[in-house]
């Protein structure tokens, strides 16, 4: 439970919907190897899934995977700088604020939270939790989740 929010932020940094996500910059913009690349996190009551999706030409698949693994390694071993962490938190909070404007999306999230945790945080409580996250927390959760112990590749 205490790892859900740090993992959501790490996933957003890695491959969230903005053009400045790590994977988009490294795989798509710098190397021109992918048409699209993104990461998503789906939490469940007792586990969750982090998925990284990319589309590329067949000949670029191995190089894309190598670049992705390099970024995962960096997240596991090198804490974000204070500036990087601050920018990531601000961007994530802005994305949360925009997504909360959808009443349907907000109510679905609140219902899921209530069913799973018997509680619903206000948006201000969520923002405060995001602001309180540390670079060490993000590195620790990245080390646990991206350690390489589990990986499934669909081609």
What feature does the model see in each segment?
Residues 1-20:
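His/Glu-based metal-binding/catalytic segments typifying zinc-dependent metallopeptidases
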Residues 35-40, 136-139:
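Glycine-rich, charged/polar anion/phosphate-binding loops
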Residues 88-155:
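C-terminal regions of mature proteins
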Residues 16-19, 38, 42-99:
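M16/insulysin-pitrilysin zinc metalloprotease superfamily fold
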Residues 31-33:
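Oxyanion-binding "anion nests"
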Residues 8-10, 27, 52, 68, ...:
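Buried hydrophobic packing residues in well-ordered domains
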């Amino acid at each position: 439970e205490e790892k859900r929010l740090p993992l959501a932020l790490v996933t957003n940094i890695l491959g969230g919907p903005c053009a400045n996500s790590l994977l988009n910059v490294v795989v798509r913009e710098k190397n021109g190897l992918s048409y699209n690349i993104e990461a998503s996190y789906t939490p469940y009551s007792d586990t969750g899934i982090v998925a990284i999706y990319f589309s590329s030409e067949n000949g670029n698949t191995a190089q894309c995977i190598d670049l992705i693994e390099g970024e995962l390694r960096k997240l596991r071993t090198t804490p974000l700088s204070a500036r990087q962490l601050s920018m990531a938190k601000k961007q994530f909070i802005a994305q949360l604020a925009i997504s909360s404007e959808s009443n349907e999306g907000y109510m679905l999230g609140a219902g899921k939270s209530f069913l799973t945790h018997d509680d619903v945080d206000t948006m201000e409580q969520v923002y405060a939790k995001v602001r309180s996250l540390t670079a060490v927390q993000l590195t620790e959760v990245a080390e646990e989740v991206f350690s390489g112990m589990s990986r499934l590749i669909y081609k």
